């Protein structure tokens, strides 16, 4: 019998080709989970999956454009069909696009809503029945759903109106869902990192990337710091639930 905390568990990680997503997949695989890697591009997924397998882990690639509701739901179904269960969902996909209402193209607003809100909702809705079943049948006696936001989503500024719309509600959604699933032993948590380099910065538009550029000499978070936070949440004993975690570099305000 394995002594790894997540032995026998199955995790689905979205945007698994990104630095944070790949780091999270590696962290969960090291804990013993089989990991379904979901992202739009299959090339990067192949590399992440190969790296996990070469280290003795179990990973499958599930290429999907999760902004398409049907494909988002199918990604969850494919994970369950191929790996037999679903114990952990990490909603890691997201994008930051900042511009004023006067100048922002509507297509950018649509992209923000499609990825930051609609995709998360469809993935969650499809996964919840499987998570409930996993909590009832797993030796861990618990399942986990982790949403990944950004501390900047709580800060209003010029040009951030629609991004704030897509992220400021994530905390309320996560907390309400946590209360709904308490009785089912499905833990629901929110991880909100500050600026991560390269990580989240790679998901910023060009203008946004320039605006948040790190001041000289100041450290920022690394992708593995966020992966460690997610790993910490899902490896707690079933008696313990971490509902929210904000992660900053020590020098960040």
Residue ranges: model-predicted function:
Residues 42-43, 63-75, 106:
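The beta1-alpha1 cofactor-binding region of Rossmann-like NAD(H)/NADP(H)-dependent oxidoreductases
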Residues 100-101, 105-113:
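Substrate-binding pocket helix/loop in short-chain dehydrogenase/reductase
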Residues 190-191, 209-253:
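C-terminal helical subdomain
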Residues 17-19:
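Conserved glycine-rich cofactor-binding loop
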Residues 124, 166:
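Active-site helix of classical SDR
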């Amino acid at each position: 019998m394995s002594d790894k905390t997540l032995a026998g568990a199955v995790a689905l990680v979205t945007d698994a080709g990104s630095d944070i997503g790949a780091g999270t997949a590696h962290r969960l695989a090291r804990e013993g989970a089989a990991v379904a890697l979901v992202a739009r591009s299959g090339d990067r997924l192949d590399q992440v999956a190969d790296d996990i397998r070469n280290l003795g882990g179990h990973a499958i690639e599930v290429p999907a454009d999760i902004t398409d509701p049907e494909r988002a739901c199918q990604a969850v179904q494919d994970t369950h069909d191929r790996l037999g269960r679903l114990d952990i969902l990490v909603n890691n996909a997201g994008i930051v696009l900042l511009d004023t209402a006067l100048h922002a193209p509507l297509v950018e607003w649509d992209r923000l809503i499609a990825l930051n809100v609609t995709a998360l909702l469809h993935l969650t809705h499809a996964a919840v029945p499987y998570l409930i079943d996993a909590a009832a049948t797993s030796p861990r006696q618990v399942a986990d759903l982790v949403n990944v936001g950004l501390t900047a989503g709580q800060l209003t500024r010029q040009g951030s109106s629609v991004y704030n719309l897509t992220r400021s509600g994530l905390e309320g959604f996560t907390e309400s869902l946590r209360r709904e699933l308490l009785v089912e032993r499905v833990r629901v948590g929110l991880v909100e990192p500050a600026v991560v380099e390269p990580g989240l910065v790679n998901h910023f538009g060009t203008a946004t990337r320039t605006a948040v550029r790190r001041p000289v000499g100041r450290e920022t978070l690394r992708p593995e710091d966020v992966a460690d936070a997610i790993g910490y949440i899902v490896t707690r004993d079933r008696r313990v639930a971490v509902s929210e975690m904000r992660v900053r570099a020590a020098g960040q305000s």
